[in-house]
Amino acid sequence: MTTLSTLNKFKKDGTKFTCLTCYDAMFARMMEKAQIDTILIGDSLGMVVQGHDSTLPVTVDDMAYHTANVARSNKQALILADLPFMSYVTLPEAIANSRKLMQVGAHVIKIEGGSELCELVTMLAQAGTPTCVHLGLTPQSVNVFGGYKVQGRGDEAGQKLLDDAKAVVNAGAALLVLECVPAELAKAVTEAVAVPVIGIGAGADTDGQVLVMHDMLGMAHGRTPRFVHDFLTDERNTEHSIEGAFALYQQSVKEGSFPKEQHQFS
């Protein structure tokens, strides 16, 4: 079974690892067969499962339901689960909501933000709840950003993101996710912190990669993000199957053939 210790060893050894979003039992079993290292029950389910145009309407109960479905069905992957929008504004509610997700099978709780999360990260760590802090493009803040845009461009913004990463790691964060940031910045963050860093639209130099499952199967609604590759229709997926797409993703990340330059931002 993949644990945080496994991911830390991967980072130390320079071994890349994989993460995919998942929301139900059947796909969780397929990912176990493909040996996907980590699974994220993301609040992206608001868009790809519930049909909303953002992640904002997702509730803690929604997250708990889908986390339980996945955790029951995959005993090999490290399970990450999102705390959804406005569910961790105060420390008491953050702790209560984290407990709810951990009790149904999450191993790590993912939260979005920067150095303002330090107190929460420390409290959760002291309570035995590992956290993954999501930096860069944070979808729960889409209205603040004015849309889904690359973050961390320019010296000031890049330094702010790097400082935030160091701060939350010093506070006790066990993992980081970097979304839609310049590849060179993602590399700098990955080298600057001791914990594993997972990238999405953040270049090839992060320790791990994550994609939304529906996107990497060519099921994206609307415009396909630049950082996505369709592994289902890839000619190397000789089975032309979902299981084959998961296995090809796992292989491609491990061998370093994904992501390529066209999947990253400068």
From Swiss-Prot:
Protein task: Catalyzes the reversible reaction in which hydroxymethyl group from 5,10-methylenetetrahydrofolate is transferred onto alpha-ketoisovalerate to form ketopantoate.
Quaternary organization: Homodecamer; pentamer of dimers.
GO biological process, one term: pantothenate biosynthetic process
Cofactor annotation comment: Binds 1 Mg(2+) ion per subunit.
Binding sites annotated in the UniProt record for Mg(2+): 43, 82, 112
Domain of life, per lineage: Bacteria
Residues annotated as binding 3-methyl-2-oxobutanoate: 43-44, 82, 110
CDD domains according to UniProt: KPHMT-like
Species annotation: Psychrobacter arcticus (strain DSM 17307 / VKM B-2377 / 273-4)
Pathway: Cofactor biosynthesis; (R)-pantothenate biosynthesis; (R)-pantoate from 3-methyl-2-oxobutanoate: step 1/2
Keywords for this protein: Cytoplasm, Magnesium, Metal-binding, Pantothenate biosynthesis, Transferase
Catalytic residues, chain numbering: 179 (proton acceptor)
Enzyme class name: transferase
Protein name per the record: 3-methyl-2-oxobutanoate hydroxymethyltransferase
Entry EC number(s): 2.1.2.11
